[in-house]
From Swiss-Prot:
Gene Ontology CC annotation, any one: cell septum
UniProt keyword list: Cell membrane, Cell wall biogenesis/degradation, Glycoprotein, Glycosyltransferase, Membrane, Sporulation, Transferase, Transmembrane, Transmembrane helix
CDD domains recorded: Chitin_synth_C
GO terms classed as biological process: cell wall organization; chitin biosynthetic process; sporulation resulting in formation of a cellular spore
Assigned EC number: 2.4.1.16
This protein's name: Chitin synthase 1
Residue ranges that the UniProt entry lists as topological domain Cytoplasmic: 1-32, 85-240, 719-720, 767-816
Purpose: Polymerizes chitin, a structural polymer of the cell wall and septum, by transferring the sugar moiety of UDP-GlcNAc to the non-reducing end of the growing chitin polymer.
Length: 816
């Protein structure tokens, strides 16, 4: 992506620059790697398959290059799992008595005289039979004047296979003695001279104290083989095996323990929030239906938070009519709200190319009402002749609302105004940045400023400190906003957070059922573990909250809530008055409104496959990545007490499309985080190592599930591999234990079993599909609209249509 210097030089919406002169682009190392890996496929072949433009062709080449790199990762995993022992270790050809398999030989075998031989007779397999064969030793005759007792079989008549080796388990159990690297079996020794030596060193390493002839006699008569030792290859294989095993299992155990600790810690009831920190409740709409939008706005309107300190902002991303809807999304939102519809379209600079870079939006200000009927307790009434009747109470909720409808420029015909969710978010992010830094504004910025002042005259627009972002199909629990704001007020290091997303349609289909446990462990295991270090790598866009800015005094104390040290400063004085106050000097640190964040997030030239996966498919996750990279000393956390509900895909094709976007954006964002050296921890005990392991684990998921099934089959049919099996039980068992402990609900055992049965889908089908569609940047079946497939022609951007002025200039013009 962009360097820090390029980010700061990146033109924001406050400046208009001349189109840059054409120049040859610098080709980086990845471009050269891509061309090298796909050099056997010429461009004319790609044109035959419909890939006509250079951008599409290079995106396809990047996809193939990435798939080749992923395949290499699979080979590395397979080699470390199976190939290392087979190739490196077994090349030593050591015949260890305890590891011999009868089926590995063409006939009967016998172990004797330090070797293994083929024989026609039957001998106990794996035992030492040296005593059965005749042995003559000149050293024995010199030492004792006779030969020691031995068998009468002639070993010279047998075919020798190889030397025999004994491991220490056999040596100790059979009472053998080791001297040097040689193993001796004194079990059939009857010579009194050797009796004390045999008794003293049985099963251990001996230290002989005999003369030369006596010891040579002992060697000739009782030699049984050599000590089984590991070759350098075996040592390397074992070292790699235990390093990976300890690392993976250590990460699993650590995640479990820290996830449990964080769950317990987060359950501590926080102090009640005064609920006076000004908050924006942002809802981004695209093609959602009326019911989904209404449920979301109702839930935000009913938030248990001060009426004067919250403002709902709905941004409709173009004149879009969702599939199955009778009205466009802007008409649905306006129909649900009590707003002034007499709004003029105002221009701004959008995140796209050509004529579409000039976009317009209408800003409607008003109120959103919810009338809810609640049943109270039953009572007996006289007209009911003693029967019980229900009494009902009507509760009315009212919240200020600002509707921003991106309507497009006059030349647009299809999907007028549609510029994407990232463009909608940057509208507000850049608006607050311009207020804080005093930068020039567009007409749309000033329109938003005026409507905010009209709706909330007691608050300056720059006084908003937090922004809650939700999708238009999310239902937020009534206490979620106050819980999240309270975290901001009590911990100034927290700059972003997410809550728990729960599934509403659990039993709609098998597709929804397999997602229940996956959603739960992604929050209470992964995000809880990351929260301990303050580095949640993904704050989901459907339900998250960010600081717009942090205001502190000179001692670093927050000024965003009631504080004794701030008694002399009015609560809702404007940002400029706070900064210029002679009573107490304050410091303002922009977070979401920081130019480093906005400029990197609003990159216009998105050319590479990596950039497109970051900014077109995973913009919410990339915003989290930018915050981690920029504010690495602050915290992004998961708050389990703040909850929301949503509907998940009920059809497999929709799930496939959704997870394609999520998996691909995850890979590219993790690659960005791998390059951040300032994450929490150091070396082997750092979040950077965890990110590396998660990235590699994501890439090898399909291969890992295949190897898992192979391991299970081998364990059942041949011999159990206990260490991998224990690790497998830990991977699937510990999350279930964690969830049972944290929820105390037995139903999650059922959801865990459903999830385990669907592991091939999660670990093979979805990742494999996502990898092969690296170059697909569409939203697929996740968001369908009527008339999909049409596109307006792209012309040249006319910057003269955009009016950019200082706020004071706009105000003076408006007051004339």
């Amino acid at each position: 992506m962009l360097s820090q210097g390029e980010i700061l030089r990146n033109p924001s919406r406050t400046r208009l620059q001349r189109p840059p002169k054409s120049r040859s682009e610098r080709k980086g190392w990845w471009y050269r790697v891509t061309i090298f890996l796909t050099c056997l496929i010429p461009n004319f072949m790609l044109r035959c398959f419909g890939m006509t433009t250079p951008e599409v062709q290079h995106a396809w080449r990047e996809k193939v290059a990435l798939c080749i790199c992923i395949f290499f990762c699979w080979i590395i995993l397979g080699f470390t799992t199976y190939g290392m022992n087979t190739i490196i270790c077994k090349g030593s050809n050591q015949y260890v008595a305890s590891r011999l398999k009868r089926d590995a030989f063409d006939g009967n075998t016998v172990i004797a005289n330090g070797g293994i031989y083929y024989t026609d007779d039957e001998y106990a397999f794996g035992e030492n039979h040296t005593y059965a064969f005749e042995k003559k030793s000149g050293a024995c005759k010199l030492a004792f004047g006779r030969q020691l007792p031995s068998g009468d079989e002639d070993i010279d008549d047998l075919e020798r296979i190889n030397d025999i080796y004994w491991d220490w388990g056999d040596i100790m159990s059979k009472g053998m003695i080791v001297v040097g690297n040689k193993v001796y079996d004194p079990s059939y020794c009857t010579e009194p001279l050797f009796e004390e030596f045999n008794r003293k060193y049985a099963g251990t390493e001996g230290k002989p104290d005999f003369d030369t002839d006596e010891w040579r006699c002992y060697e000739d008569m009782f030699y049984a083989g050599k000590v089984a030792t590991k070759t350098p290859g075996c040592l390397l294989a074992d070292t790699m095996f235990w390093i990976t095993t300890i690392s993976i299992f250590g990460l699993i155990i650590t995640k479990f323990l820290l996830g449990f600790f964080y769950s317990w810690y987060a359950k501590r009831r926080p102090k009640p929030s005064p609920k006076i920190t000004p908050c924006i409740l942002l809802v981004t709409c695209y093609s959602e239906g009326k019911d989904g939008i209404k449920n979301t706005l109702d839930s935000l309107c009913k938030q248990d938070y001060g009426y004067d300190y919250k403002l709902i902002v709905v941004i409709c991303d173009g004149n879009i009519t969702g599939s199955g809807n009778s009205m466009s999304t802007p008409d649905i939102v306006l129909g649900l709200s009590d707003v002034d519809r007499r709004a003029e379209p105002k221009g701004y600079i959008s995140l796209t190319h050509g004529t579409k870079r000039y976009n317009r939006a209408k800003v409607h200000a008003g109120y959103y009402h919810v009338r809810e009927e609640k049943k109270s307790r039953r009572y007996r009434c006289w007209p009911c002749f003693g029967r019980q009747a229900d009494s009902s109470e009507v509760e009315n909720y009212k919240t200020r609302i600002l509707v921003i409808n991106k309507c497009g420029n006059p030349s647009e015909t299809f999907k007028a105004g549609n510029r994407g969710k990232r463009d909608s978010q940057v509208i507000l992010m850049s608006f607050f940045s311009k207020l804080i830094y005093g930068d020039r504004m567009t007409e749309l910025d000033f329109e938003i400023y005026q409507k905010m002042k009209f709706l909330m005259p007691h608050i300056e627009p720059e006084d908003f400190e937090c922004i809650l972002m939700v999708d238009a199909d999310t239902i937020v629990k009534p206490d979620a906003l106050s819980i999240m704001v309270n975290v901001f007020e009590t911990d100034q290091k927290v700059i972003g957070m997410c809550g728990e997303t729960m599934i509403l349609n659990k039993f709609e289909s098998w597709v929804t059922m397999i997602q229940v446990f996956e959603y739960y462990i992604s929050h209470h295991l992964s995000k809880a573990f990351e929260s301990v270090f303050g580095g949640v790598t993904c704050l989901p866009g459907c339900f998250c909250m960010y600081r717009i800015k942090i205001v502190t005094n000179q001692q670093g104390q927050l000024l965003s809530g009631p504080s004794k040290s701030r008694a002399s400063v009015p609560r809702f004085s404007s940002m400029k008055s706070i900064l210029s106050s002679s009573l107490e000097k304050s410091l303002c640190l922009p977070i979401l409104a920081n130019p480093a964040i906005i400029n990197a997030y609003s990159v216009l030239e998105v050319k590479t496959l990596h950039q497109k996966n970051l900014l077109h498919l995973g913009e919410d996750r990339y915003l989290t990545t930018l915050l981690l990279k920029t504010f690495y000393r602050r915290k992004l956390v998961f708050i389990p007490a703040a909850k929301c509900e949503t509907y998940v895909p009920g059809e497999f094709s929709v799930l496939l499309s959704q997870r394609r976007r999520w998996i691909n954006s995850t890979i590219h964002n993790l690659f960005e985080l791998v390059q951040v050296n300032n994450l929490c921890g150091a070396f082997c005990f750092s979040m950077q190592l965890v990110v590396v392991m998660e990235l590699f684990g994501t890439l090898v998921l399909p291969a890992a599930i295949i190897f898992t099934f192979v391991m299970i089959a081998v364990s059942i049919l041949i011999e159990p591999a206990w260490v991998p099996l224990i690790m497998l039980v830990g991977i699937f068992g510990l999350p279930a234990v964690l969830i049972l402990i944290t929820t105390m609900e037995i139903q999650y055992v059922f959801w865990c079993l459903v999830y385990i049965l669907s592991i091939p889908i999660w670990n093979f089908v979805l990742p494999t599909y996502a990898f092969w569609h690296f170059d697909n940047f569409s939203w697929g079946d996740t968001r369908k609209v009527d008339g999909e497939g049409k596109e307006d022609e792209e012309g040249e951007f006319d910057h003269t249509k955009i009016r950019i002025r200082e706020l004071e200039e706009f105000l003076s013009e408006a007051n004339k």
